Amino acid sequence: MDFAGRVVCRDVFEYPYPDPRTLFPALESKLARVNQALGANASKVVGVGVAAPLWLGGWRDFLGAPPDALDAWHEIDLRSRIATMTGLPVEFAKDTTAACAAELVMGQGRGIHNFLYLFVGTFIGGGLVIDGRLHGGPHDNAGAVGSIPLRDGGARKPARQLLHAASGFVLERLLSDAGKPAAAAHDHRALSPEMWRHTEEWLDTACPAIANALTSAAALLDLEAVVIDGELDRQMVREIIRRTERVLDRFEWEGMVRPQLLEGAIGADARAMGGAILPLYAHFAPVHELFLKPATEAAY
């Protein structure tokens, strides 16, 4: 991404779970292709931004990954590994915090100054903006909405945390169990008549769970808005907002200010674009700590 926020080059590597034995060779290969595509402009690259979960070795039961693949992350310094690979400075942020940074700089954040950000990817996660600044907190984990405990899991079965009810992987499994392609959870096919029954089953659990989490957040944070985005079809994002608003209509708001729900402006690439912002702010922003993780390393 260039200084004006334009995406210069884009590539994708899909994997069922983050296995460093396959991820790093693929990443090295793709970075080499990017450098080749940039040609003479490769020398102008100021750094690499990494947007990744803080705990890459977690939630193995849901990813279906072998223990040895995820355990390896506990011994890996991701920032150092990529710096060695590229020879460039590396900046790091939690993936959904990076997505929130993109929304703050290039999306709804240009008009609102206090908002909670939700991103529905494989897992649901988020970020937090207070007084126009990205707020990470002492552990750089503010806005970890996926870990909010739930009072109940909606219509079907109990869920321990919001991520068990409202994450994309839940819809992926519903589709897969029905003999449908799991990847359809993240595009227009999820809204097709053929798959709508499974999508609606997910929405019936996800939206009440999101609404419950948002009431707690609104009471604690006094928000202007909640911005919802995801690695989803845009109509699906709007359907989540519509159904969540319907649930919120039934809640008692006395003593609280109900935040407006807004559709994110960036979309599926928010995490990657937020990551790409990080080196630019490290070099050019007057107070780049507002956007970047401190030097202390995350636990993978």
Where are the model-predicted features located?
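ATP-binding/phosphotransfer module of carbohydrate and carboxylate kinases, centering on a glycine-rich
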Residues: M1-K44, T84-T86, D152-Y300
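Phosphate-binding/catalytic loop of phosphoryl-transfer enzymes
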Residues: F3, K44-R160, G274, L278-E297
